[in-house]
């Protein structure tokens, strides 16, 4: 699937190594390969954006390697492609040898997979399903500040789905573990690939059922009910968390204004 980059190849360039992204001038590179010293490198086309190819190059650059979070303000589609590139680069880097027999592996020519030439085992990129849920109580929404977000941002609750668990069960468990409350009338909204490091966020809205807020201090710094017209600092636009909050605010406005 990959090939040698030629002088006139052009498009968007996702140059990634160890979950980092090359961002010269803080931007995702766009243009001809020669402008970025990429001629002769191997590249894999991972999609298209506005009619232009998006290429993955597995390479470490000496300068300007940053987090894919730095391009979160890009259009959602381009951000997702950048995230795909970072995840694929890490997948190929971490699957050089077979986990079953220890022999060297090679990339498939027909799909995103690594193949073992010895035992014929086939590996695909790992995706970790997560739930994220906006909980409404009358004219208020439950927002929390997570221990990993010490920048004042308040967001909705989220967590990983466990083995043998449905998405609905994961919502109920995560909400209870993190906040101590029960929810009802769960409704699926949307999903979003989230490359930190390899999650697929499944987004829900729910209504408060019962219980008082009792936070898990390992997960949250604080959690509280916030009236829809008096909210704290929120996640940036383009994130599924922001989408859930805005949808909840719209519902509250429709009822209370």
Curated annotation (Swiss-Prot):
InterPro entries reported in the protein's UniProt record: NAD-cap_RNA_hydrolase_NudC (IPR050241), NudC-like_C (IPR049734), NUDIX_hydrolase-like_dom_sf (IPR015797), NUDIX_hydrolase_CS (IPR020084), NUDIX_hydrolase_dom (IPR000086), RNA_Hydrolase_NudC (IPR022925), Znr_NADH_PPase (IPR015376)
Keyword Acyltransferase listed: no
Cofactor field: Mg(2+); Mn(2+); Zn(2+)
Transmembrane annotation, as ranges: none
Result, substituting residue 194 to A: Abolished deNADding activity
BP-aspect Gene Ontology terms: mRNA catabolic process; mRNA stabilization; NAD catabolic process; NAD-cap decapping; NADH metabolic process; NADP catabolic process
Activity vs pH: Optimum pH is 8.5.
PANTHER family, per the entry: NAD-CAPPED RNA HYDROLASE NUDT12, NUDIX HYDROLASE, NUDC SUBFAMILY
HAMAP family registered for this protein in UniProt: Nudix_NudC
Subunit text: Homodimer.
Similarity comment: Belongs to the Nudix hydrolase family. NudC subfamily.
Protein name: NAD-capped RNA hydrolase NudC
Species annotation: Escherichia coli (strain K12)
Gene that encodes it: nudC
């Amino acid at each position: 699937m990959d090939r040698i980059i030629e002088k006139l190849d052009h498009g968007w360039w996702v140059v990634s190594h160890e979950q980092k992204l090359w961002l010269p001038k803080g931007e995702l590179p766009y243009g001809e390969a020669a402008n970025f010293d990429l001629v002769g490198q191997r590249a894999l086309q991972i999609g298209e954006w506005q009619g232009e190819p998006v290429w993955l190059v597995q390479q470490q650059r000496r300068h300007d390697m940053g987090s894919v979070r730095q391009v979160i303000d890009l259009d959602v589609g381009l951000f997702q492609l950048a995230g795909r590139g970072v995840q694929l680069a890490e997948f190929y880097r971490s699957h050089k040898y077979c986990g079953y027999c220890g022999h060297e592996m090679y990339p498939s020519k027909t799909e995103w997979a690594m193949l073992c030439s010895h035992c014929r085992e086939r590996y695909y990129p790992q995706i970790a399903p997560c739930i994220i849920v906006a909980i409404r109580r009358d004219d208020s929404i439950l927002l929390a500040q997570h221990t990993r977000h010490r920048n004042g941002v308040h967001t909705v609750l989220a967590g990983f789905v466990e083995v043998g668990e449905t998405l609905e069960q994961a919502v109920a468990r995560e909400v209870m573990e993190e906040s101590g409350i029960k929810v009802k009338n769960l409704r699926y909204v949307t999903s979003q690939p989230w490359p930190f490091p390899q999650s697929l966020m499944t987004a829900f809205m729910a209504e408060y059922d019962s219980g008082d807020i009792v936070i898990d201090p390992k997960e949250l710094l604080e959690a509280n009910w916030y009236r829809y017209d008096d909210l704290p600092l929120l996640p940036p636009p383009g994130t599924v968390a922001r989408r859930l909050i805005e949808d909840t605010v719209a519902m509250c406005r429709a009822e209370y204004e």
